Amino acid sequence: MTAEQALPLGNGKAAEEARGSEALGGGGGGAAGTREARDKAVHERGHWNNKVEFVLSVAGEIIGLGNVWRFPYLCYKNGGGAFLIPYVVFFICCGIPVFFLETALGQFTSEGGITCWRRVCPLFEGIGYATQVIEAHLNVYYIIILAWAIFYLSNCFTTELPWATCGHEWNTEKCVEFQKLNFSNYSHVSLQNATSPVMEFWERRVLAISDGIEHIGNLRWELALCLLAAWTICYFCIWKGTKSTGKVVYVTATFPYIMLLILLIRGVTLPGASEGIKFYLYPDLSRLSDPQVWVDAGTQIFFSYAICLGCLTALGSYNNYNNNCYRDCIMLCCLNSGTSFVAGFAIFSVLGFMAYEQGVPIAEVAESGPGLAFIAYPKAVTMMPLSPLWATLFFMMLIFLGLDSQFVCVESLVTAVVDMYPKVFRRGYRRELLILALSIVSYFLGLVMLTEGGMYIFQLFDSYAASGMCLLFVAIFECVCIGWVYGSNRFYDNIEDMIGYRPLSLIKWCWKVVTPGICAGIFIFFLVKYKPLKYNNVYTYPAWGYGIGWLMALSSMLCIPLWIFIKLWKTEGTLPEKLQKLTVPSADLKMRGKLGASPRMVTVNDCEAKVKGDGTISAITEKETHF
């Protein structure tokens, strides 16, 4: 297109690949021609074949387990329908702005989660490292949930679910089937100390949980095999980059909706379903005065939108330059929140049925997180006719929901590494070997969470390594970097060059003021209200356990200030001169659309630069900084 002719560098990619091809394709004859063709294929970064692949990949990443097991419970816990008020506020002020920022940044720079920040503002390259550290932690522990789900699924192919009854080798004498309990016959049983078969299956059969993190115990080899299966599937979903990922998401991103629809129809037709839905949505406006309700709404937005992980930047970087990422982001954000809302009906209708069957208040059966997926819902399906069928559908839905979130995260980390060292990893099968190495290392690191004390380690990862506190910290710096240092007006020019028009000004002001202000407020609230983690609200970790948790949290957050300090220390000159140099975007970061191709004095990244005679744009001037 015209822009590419005027700006042959294409943000540095085309020129770099062309130089690599020329350098490696020397010599003559057929061998040289073959080598040149091979090098051209190796150095090609790749792109989505069509918009559908991008949309499904992003949808698969952001629509995950949190939509099913976290949002409905938070809605019920925080005032039902009243919770939607703070949720919508954060949806508009934080969710959409940061989601759009990361996607547009990836599309404009055509870079992964680290090098995109290096090109935009070298001083804030630490943002990229922070996101990838969080993602590396996430890749290790998130897939553990898939291993559990695969294990449960493998136990569904039977006439009677193993967690439906007592009498198995893993059950204790305290096991009581409550739905069959006759109080006159079981007067000698202390119901206060009794446990359900579904709880014993989870704690004694699946986890074989020890009494604390101090006692790691033996490896659960069955779960290790399930984890191996999960990593094998994940590897082959992404081993060819966008070529394989773009095809796999047609199944992994759409199948959960089919399962959710089936479970929704089944749920709302059960007795007691209406009571469950009532508890899910009945508004309690008095809860809005509780700051924790607003904090829960904000953190849920960050969790469910996969922001501050580098995933959206990586996925956006494979788009065509002129893709309308603004429209895509609005649509995907609405789809994500809509899915969470509908999932609440599917979950709470079943919980209402379970409360009805047991004759207890729904508050006693409502759960979130693993408690919902592996205790509450499995217990509910045992009360239904054809319970193995419904259990199979439920765990298949969980696996597909988690699978695409997992492999997209791994793909994003790989993209970040490959874009940092393109000449190393874009040759032969090195990219595939990199994915294999990351998968193997992550697999062995994850095995520690499949030991008898592994659940305690899993909770540390979940509460510290990829916590809302880390995401909020990164979001503050992302907004400051784009809104103030790089410049929101400059970034709006870049976006206009890509999509042909400027987005609503509200998003720009969110980047500059609203989003960082809200994130800072919630971050401070987190620190002030911090309470040490307890497993099941009972087990207290030893001091060194909390130390490990905080080290994992700081491992990502410290990347940003440490990188700023290192760059300032290594750069020569006075402090103003250092800031001047480190806040200027990369010289080859250019607009490739109509604005960038205009044969006149053009505005490139808010600075004036003259078009040279060869059609390229002169280097970025010193004016291109806000310092």
UniProtKB/Swiss-Prot annotation:
Signal peptide: none annotated. GABA transport is inhibited by beta-alanine. The chain crosses the membrane at residues 54-74, 82-101, 126-146, 221-239, 248-265, 301-318, 330-351, 384-403, 433-451, 468-488, 509-528, 548-566. It catalyses: 4-aminobutanoate(out) + chloride(out) + 2 Na(+)(out) = 4-aminobutanoate(in) + chloride(in) + 2 Na(+)(in); taurine(out) + chloride(out) + 2 Na(+)(out) = taurine(in) + chloride(in) + 2 Na(+)(in); beta-alanine(out) + chloride(out) + 2 Na(+)(out) = beta-alanine(in) + chloride(in) + 2 Na(+)(in); hypotaurine(out) + chloride(out) + 2 Na(+)(out) = hypotaurine(in) + chloride(in) + 2 Na(+)(in). The modification Phosphoserine is found at S21. Its main location: membrane. This is Sodium- and chloride-dependent GABA transporter 3. It comes from Rattus norvegicus (Rat).
